[in-house]
Amino acid sequence: MSTIRPVFYVSDGTGITAETIGHSLLTQFSGFSFITDRMSFVDDPEKAREACSRIQAAGERYQVRPIVVNSCVDQSLSLILAESGALMLDVFAPFIEPLERELSSSRVNRVGQAHGMVDFDTYHRRINAMNFALTHDDGIAVNYDDADVILVAVSRAGKTPTCIYLALHYGVRAANYPLTDEDLESDRLPPRLRNYRRKLFGLTIDPDRLQQIRQERRPNSRYANLDTCKREVAAAEVMFQMERIPTLSTTHTSIEEISSKVLATLGLQRELY
């Protein structure tokens, strides 16, 4: 049985930085069930004390020391959070002092700098990419001329969350195409995709894991049947191989890793926002 550990991502901004780094760290450890909670915009002492109380309550509930991944810039807020007795992991602390020495300059304690709306062009690019991902989700729209990437996979293999992550974090216009039973009758690309071969990236998944995911969505249906999952995954993988479409298994791969692999494979040079 997995050991439960409560984890809090605390930030004076959106919390994206703390959560991204924290998630990457936690994936290095097995045998634990991490109960995570993101606390965003903890930017004054009152909010910090409220956060401290919630963290303490979690420790009492689970009878174990909570873990806090903290990206608050104001050190006075971090001190309040530390009163919770949690293990405090400061996102910036290991890097600020060496950088200050190297650059001979003190940091600017600017709240929300990592994900602020300082660059409006960048902000609008992310919003437009997000709208594109939603419009072109699950084959809703099939005009892919403006797409940077088109993720192709069977249903519930991780297409949608990856597209949204690519949009929000990289401003990438990511569409996705769900392979249907009709598509899988052939080992060739569906007609709608043939003109966009260079934009395609295939996602595959272990059939047992796919069955678990589908069972949660449509219990005891043909859609969630293990044989159906095996047949669809096998047919999709044959298609990807025949058409030489780059492919990645999402079974044990985080969205962050999938996104990085997609960008690198398709040669999309984008900075993380």
Curated annotation (Swiss-Prot):
Query: What is this protein identified as?
Result: Putative phosphoenolpyruvate synthase regulatory protein
PANTHER family documented for this protein: PYRUVATE, PHOSPHATE DIKINASE REGULATORY PROTEIN 1, CHLOROPLASTIC (PTHR31756:SF3)
Query: Which top-level group of life is the source organism from?
Result: Bacteria
The main enzyme category here is transferase
Q: Where does ADP bind?
A: 153-160
Listed EC numbers: 2.7.11.33, 2.7.4.28
Which residues pair up as cystines? none
Q: Which reaction does it catalyse?
A: [pyruvate, water dikinase] + ADP = [pyruvate, water dikinase]-phosphate + AMP + H(+); [pyruvate, water dikinase]-phosphate + phosphate + H(+) = [pyruvate, water dikinase] + diphosphate
What organism is recorded for this protein? Answer: Stenotrophomonas maltophilia (strain R551-3)
NCBIfam families per record: PRK05339.1
**Does Chaperone show up as a keyword for this record?**
no
Summary of the function given for this chain in its UniProt record: Bifunctional serine/threonine kinase and phosphorylase involved in the regulation of the phosphoenolpyruvate synthase (PEPS) by catalyzing its phosphorylation/dephosphorylation.
Task: Give the InterPro entries listed for this entry.
Answer: Kinase-pyrophosphorylase, PSRP
